[in-house]
């Protein structure tokens, strides 16, 4: 484990035990970027997970937003012997790029399954800008993990973001077209089969995060694609 990771693990443990309520204590919170302020706690928890022996040398990682983070049965559903879930809630493609070096690179996975873009579009990002963010991320992945095979799961339609469906479709198409020219990346189309089946049925009380039926579809699509590259 990198020295920075070890320091972060110790800091996270300390922070969870000691809450600062003293008004005389000077905080560096204002020096932290909005991205770091929003996601730092979740990322530190992931670094603690990485520190555990049971999570070392995982061949496959899930990386991205709460679509992955909330997938509690991912390892069982996917039936992968070695799987590490590095999803963190509310994350954007931008924040994934920010934390990629800290929580994915040290694991050096054989395969990375990636889901992000949902929250970027929800915050008003255009399809073109999202495409550009993906290109920046893909470039960094290629530089830091050139031997990792990567899978981009298309942005899903949802009841909550139905007004953004056209942007989602355009963003998926743009990224898919780019991936066709990238030897390191593969595209997993989650969006089309959800639309074909009537995407509303893949959601229950929560209009943004999928139900069991949605994860059943996602796991099948991932297994089918990964099976093409099993060693």
Roles of regions detected by a PLM:
Residues 159-231:
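Catalytic His-Asp segment of secreted/periplasmic serine-dependent ester chemistry enzymes
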Residues 63-64, 153, 188:
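Active-site flanking residues adjacent to catalytic metal/cofactor-binding acidic residues
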Residues 57, 80-82, 147, 184-187:
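A generic structural signal for alpha->beta connector loops
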Residues 131-153, 170, 174-185:
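Charged, glycine-enriched surface loops/patches
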Residues 115, 153-154:
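Alpha/beta-hydrolase-fold catalytic nucleophile elbow
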Residues 1-5:
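Conserved small/polar residues in nucleotide/adenosyl-binding loops
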Residues 7-43, 181, 221-231:
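Conserved catalytic region of serine esterases and O-acyltransferases that act on ester linkages
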Residues 30-136, 159-169:
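Conserved SGNH/GDSL esterase-like catalytic core that processes O-acyl groups on lipids
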